[in-house]
Each structure stands twice: as structure tokens, then as C-alpha cells.
Amino acid sequence: MYGYNGEDPGGGQVLQPSLADAIRAFTSGTIGPEDFHAVFTSCKVFCPRGERPGFLALHDTPQPVIPMFSSLAELRHYSGEQSRFFTVTGAEVLDLLPGGYGIVLDIEGEHRVVFDAQAIEQMIDYTMRRMYG
């Protein structure tokens, strides 16, 4: 075999980039929307938690957005060490997000990315087409 020693150190698994890596790659143009979508929908997303169930929204923006984070460290940087949170997958975000809201990933991070409500609708449509044809 050329270039292989016959061993598979990765156990046959393809390593997927972290959400933080995908955000950096997406904002720098290294990956496109489809690749970002694939990572986002399968990764864990950290969300600030309030007193009542549901997403916490920022309404002091042109359109309401919901802050979400690629890691607990990013969330803690934004909302403090003792902040409460919950986690969902990106796919669950797309399923549960109320209409008319966008999201901002890693709002205080070096590579923050904002998806307005229209972009979220496009992500949902893309997901539905991939799932149901």
C-alpha cells in the first residue's frame, strides 16, 4: 500500500471540526455555507439561560437575535463565570428557534458571526431539502 502502514490510528472515524473552528473558517471564507451548516447542525451549542425556559433574545439590535456560543468558555466570557446555560445541537436550534429571530454566535469572540432571521429561514429550508428531498 502506498503511503499507508496498514494501521488505522483514527479508528476509521473522520474527525469533524469544532464549532469554533467552523466559525473561524466560515468568517474567513475557508468553508462555504453548506460545510458550515453540516458542522453547525451536529455540534453542541451553549445558550444563556434565564428564569423561564427558552432562548434569551437581544432586542437592542436592528432585528432581535439570540446569543449562542461555541463553547462554555465563550459563554462565560460573555455572561460571567456563574451564568446559567443549557445546550442544544445546532439542528435543535433550527427546530426550536422562534420565527423572526436571528442568532449571533460567539458575540464577543474574535470571529463572531451573525445570521439574521432571513438567513435562519434559509438554513431551515436547506435542512428540510436535505432531509426530505
What are these regions (language model features)?
Residues 1-133:
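An interfacial alpha-helical scaffold signature
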